[in-house]
Amino acid sequence: MDIENGNLKIIFQKISYTNINENKPDKDKKHNYYKVNKQQYLKQAPTIFPQYSKDEHEHNYYLLEQDMKDKHTDNKSVFQYVINVADKLLVYDGNEVLCKFNQLLRWREISFQFGQDFFVCAFRAAKDIYYSNRTKFFAWNPIIRSDNNRLHNILNRGMAENHFHLGGSTKIFELNWICLMNLIDGRRHDFKKIEIGLQEYYSDRLDMQERKEEFYVECQKAALIRVYLFACLKGNQFIKDTADNLLNYEEMIASNISKIQDFISTCKSRFGASIKGEGILDYALEKNMMDCNDNECRILAGERRFLYDCYRAILEGKFDDKQKNLFYKYLCIRTHFRGELIQVNKRVGFTNFQQYQRRKQYFIQGEKAYEKELVRLALNESLNKENMVSLEARICPGKTSLEMEKEFYNFNKIVEEVKDEDKQKKLFYVLHFPKIKDKDFCLGMPRNYNARCAAEAGMRSIVAFFERDAKFNDGVRGIDTCASELDCRPEVYAQIYRYLSDIIIQDKNGGLLEGGDQKRKLKMTYHAGEDFLDLTDGLRAIDEVIRFCGLHRGSRIGHALALGLDPYKYYECKNWEVILTKQILLDDLAWILNQAKAIGCMPDYELKMKLESQFHNLYNEIYENNIISEYQVSIRDYYCSWKLRGDNPELYRLSEKEFLQKMKYPERTMSKYQRYEFNSYKEDEINVIRRNKNIRNLYFAYHYNENVRKKGEERIRFKVDCKYAELIFQVQNNMIRKFVDEGIAIETNPSSNYLIGTIKKYDEHPIFRFNSRKLKQ
């Protein structure tokens, strides 16, 4: 790990804020803003710097001591260390703070841990003192730019934002923190939502109920420190003295939470700017700031100004030792809270990612003014960028068409604040279906019955929305899926995708299928190959989307990490062994063997025999003793039964006569939606398979046989080698060529892929493999 990044982690994350104390008589235990405790540093160093020896850790400590000094005055502090690190990464051009382009990746890694404002405000305060200046503008963009003008010129040609989650594409931590710091009373229920600690060095502190209470008390202390330091900056002696008394008896803070809220209310009424229709959102966003900061980023300006003023007061000697230590505590608590909302841990997989996603609005939920600011900051700030060509925002369909219409109305009302109508038109929406984890076996119900019902309800509300009124129709462009792939496979959404992609939407003056001139169909994106138990499993999921969901030219696969990851590096990362369910491994073996045969890249004889043997052993375990078959089922037969999974499983409960009749005359069904029960992908080939009773029985058992389900859910270890990795590599290349031929795009998301996947560096991202031809040119 980068030495500066590691040192920042130790002094602001690993060493608890409770250890910051000026008055400890024992020098060996003293830890404060100007003296990092050596014993505590060396205790934490092995987990942060495992590549270094004990002696090297000691050298790192003394290097930290040196780097905490101001090069002009020799004053030493953790704040100066932040400024010195920022000085290596940032530059001030006289107008704005920019990231040095040659430090871009370091800036990403370091600022991701603490937030950009943590460094930018410190850097700006130091520069303003040096240039005898005082910044008034704090509503700068959420993400600062680099100093590479050539890159800006390229980006100014136009950019499309094709994957924009409202809750994940904005300053989530800052919004929650500002709301919490202004509304700290009555928050116990919000902290109880945090079931476990997600940061490695804090997880044990949050996993028990009493520790969740401690986390709330910790944030109460931060709120008290913030209002106290704010009063110091503003010269409000009453709040300063009263809050100071409370800070001297920290054990009394939790029982005096209403008093802290009173301090905040006093500061709000005296200093806070009232935002039209929303009231005072942050007392640190002062009345005299609105002339310079009334834009889409205004909600961020108060906290930035507070950080800037505190850093400046420290550098100018206006804060005493106690106030400096309190600000150090505030930064530590702030960083801890941020780490429970922003994915700064290094765990891979979608579940970890999803746990963070669920927390995005815990502390602003129900606070309408802050919820509006979230939408305003997310949408309007992006739409106002001159180079933004289009913005594709993703939301879940409402439970009813009326609920959806109301949500679009609220969004549009906020977007209308962007005065330029052409900019407003850049925004459109994609409705995504959340994947839901399967429940236990229930007699007569297919796999993922709960997800199928929820998705069908969402589909019906979408169709009713389009039929209801064309006012917002032209704002909805497509459909997608979201949440964990491991919870349910593409087969669950197959019929819904085929149906929704075929309906005709009326954009103006009229409803679905009726009247008007502007008609179109919904576009399709499906998130697949992002999270998987094995690379083969991820590739099969991508193939299932193409086969079952009716994707065609112009459609997109979201992420598709499995399609581009280096199989050798992936399996090496997994120690050449993966753990998955027997059912998934059985499916994967049948799929990979048939893929290899189809593209003419059969593995060597030894590997082929090994894979076939594993298939037959698993098949016998799961199916052989639980179904009736007139002959020995081959790998090809099983693969054919897999091809039927795009069909609605309810069809396979019909008698043979009813099934064949329905297959022959699908148009005679009750509703248009039912006409899409059969998958039409390579229909002639699939119809031959459907007429085979033994293959139909396999598909029926897959869904409705309890013993098959139970046996298939057992876990198994699957060992692979370099020969298997080579086979996967060839299958990947063939699938990439197929995507090119069929005109299906891959929607890449480098930042979330880096967090979810096994790639260690951005230059390992599959996008370089997908675009290798043009890069080589």
Question: Which ranges hold each PLM region?
Answer:
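Metal-cofactor-binding active-site regions of metalloenzymes
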Residues: 1-777
